[in-house]
Every structure is written in structure tokens, then in C-alpha cells.
Curated annotation (Swiss-Prot):
Keywords: Cell membrane, Lipoprotein, Membrane, Palmitate, Signal. The keyword Cell membrane applies. It is a lipid-anchor. This is Probable lipoprotein CPn_0875/CP_0994/CPj0875/CpB0904. Residues 1-21 form the signal peptide.
Amino acid sequence: MKRVIYKTIFCGLTLLTSLSSCSLDPKGYNLETKNSRDLNQESVILKENRETPSLVKRLSRRSRRLFARRDQTQKDTLQVQANFKTYAEKISEQDERDLSFVVSSAAEKSSISLALSQGEIKDALYRIREVHPLALIEALAENPALIEGMKKMQGRDWIWNLFLTQLSEVFSQAWSQGVISEEDIAAFASTLGLDSGTVASIVQGERWPELVDIVIT
């Protein structure tokens, strides 16, 4: 009788154990039940993960196109032809005042003063940027005060380098537009007592800093 009772109890415990095991995974951890909301969220996350690389690629291509357009716009701006004066026109009194103002400012003013005066300096530079390159250099060479100012600028590296860079860009544009002729070079060299062959070589090679050096030394 006792054996039957023990057997019945054992079978019952076995049944309860088997039922409870249905809520456990093989490793003994509780399985989490997921509702439809959780499943939908996981679906969205997986979809986003799949779409993210393609989105990044699209944005990258769009950025490259944007910067390419900007770069082309900048190039187009640089290629716009300037209305340079001829060498025979020389420079006007206003041009001389503007040139003196730019040189004296760059030679004498402190960095703070230059920053405060940058609007006036830019206006003066804009007005003289279309002066014929050789006429501009000739005006520098024939004015002792300007030569002295240029020498002071040489002692201020960043200002001098900036000046030469800007001057070279404008002069190279003039050369590319055919503004500087062989006759201009010959007349310029004759006026300043320079060798025309040397000047021609410098101009044709667009070695503008060298041209500045030979007229202020």
C-alpha cells in the first residue's frame, strides 16, 4: 500500500516538474515573452540598421556634389577677366594715394590697427588692382617713401608673404589675359635702367616676387 502511495506521489512530482520546465529554456533561464509591440520595435531597428549604410552613402555623394559645385563656383569667379589699364595709362593721383596708404599701413600699423583698418585697406586694394602690373611696380620703384615702406614690410614676414601672394595672383591674371606686352616690358626696363632680357624672363616665368626685389634693392 505504501509502495502504491509513494509511486503515485512520485508520478505527480514528475508531472509537475515536466510542466514547470516548459517555461524554462534548455539552459534554465526564463524565456521572455514578447508582445507585438516589442516585435514591431525590433523590426524597425533592423530596418534602420539595413538602411543606415545606404543613407550614409547618399549623404556622402550629395556632400561631394555640393563641394564640387562650390569649388567650381570659386574657379569660375577666379576666371572672370579683370579690366586692367594699359601700361601707357600709368597711374593716377588716386592710385598713388591708395598705394601709399596700403604700403604705409602694412609697414607701420600694429596687427590690431590693421584689423581695424581692413575695410579701408580692402577698398584701396580694390581700386588699384586693375592698375597695369608694370606701371604699379614702376610707381613703387620711383617713390623713395614707398621703397622704404616695402623694406619695412619685408621685416614683417606674414604681412610681406600675404602681400606677395595677393600681388602675384593679380599679376598672373594680367599676364594670362595678355595685358603685358613685349613693348611694355622693354619700356619698363628702359625707364628703370634694367636689362630688358632679365625683366622679360622674370615676367614670362611669372616670378613676381623677384621682380619686386630687383626694383626695391
